[in-house]
Amino acid sequence: MAGGYFHSIRLLRSQCQGCVTCVKACPTEAIRVRNGKAELIEARCIDCGECLRRCGYHAIVAETDKLEETEQFKYNIALPPPSLYAQFPPETSAAAIWEGLHRLGFDEIFDVAVASEYISLEIAAYLKNYNGGRKPLISCTCPAVLRLIQVKFPELIKQVVPVLPPTEAAAIYVKNEVMQRTGLKSEEIGVWFIAPCPSKNANIRQSVDVRHTQINGSLSISEIYGKILKIMGGEIQPDKKVTAGSSYGMSWGSYGGELEAAGIENGLAVHGINDVYDVLEQISLNKMRDVDYVESVSYTHLTLPTNS
C-alpha cells in the first residue's frame, strides 16, 4: 500500500505483455508501462476495475477474501447485493440462493436491499431539504466514484449526499441485532459482503465513506456464484435466518434503480466509469445545474477475475 491507500487491484508481471491496453483504459492515468511491464501508480488508482475488464492476458486480478476466513468467527452473516441474484437464471428462486449461502457456512443472510430501502428515504429527505446549494447532488454509494472525485474532482466533494452506503448501513444494523439476539460479542460475529467490483473490496479495508467499517471482509461475487451453483438443489431448510429486501431495495441493482427507489424524477443515472468521468467533468464546470441528483456507478457488468 503506497500513499496510505489500500488497493484490491493487482498486476501480475509474469502474465503482462506490455500491450498498454490497461494504460489506455484507466480513467485516472494510474498505470504506466516500464521495461515492457505494466506498473500501478497507487496514488491515482481508484479500484474501478476498468483495467481488469480490458486486459486480454489475465494479467490483472482483484483481491478478495477467502471463504475459509469465515471459520474464525462463531457466527457469520452474508450481505448479498441485488446484483448477486441477477447472476442466476430467472427460474432460480431467491430461496434456493439463500439455501446455497447457508450450505457455504453462513448462519444468517441479510439483503443489502433492505438497507437500500431506508437509505432511499434518507436521500429523498436530504434532497427535499437541500436549499441554496450547488447542484446536482451526487450519489455516495460507489467507492470508485468517491475515489474518482477525491483524485480528479475534489471540488465536488461537498455535492456528495452525506448518507451511509447501503452496504455499511446493513452491516451496522445486522451486527447490532445479532449481538442483542444471541449475546455474542462483536468480534465473534463475521459480516461478509458479496462484492460485485474491486472498489468495494478495497473500501472494506480502507473506507472512503466511513471511519470504521462493520464489515469483516468481502467475497467475490463470481466465486460465490460458482460455489452456489455446485451445491444447489435439495430441500430448503426453513429454520435459517433470512432478511429479504423488497422490490424497491432490489431496484438498486439495476440502471436507474436508485433514482426510482428514492422517488427522484429530475435525476440522471450514469453507469460505467468513463461515462461517470464525463458527467463529473460537466458538473465541475457547473453545466448541469438543472439536474437534482446523479446516480453514479463505476461498473456496467459484474463478472470479474479474482486472485482465487
Regions found by a protein language model. Give the residues of each.
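Short acidic, glycine/serine/threonine-rich loops at helix termini
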Residues: 89-91, 121-124, 149-153, 202-208, ...
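A short, acidic, amphipathic alpha-helical segment used as a generic capping/interface helix at domain edges
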Residues: 272-288
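Conserved small/polar residues in nucleotide/adenosyl-binding loops
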Residues: 300-306
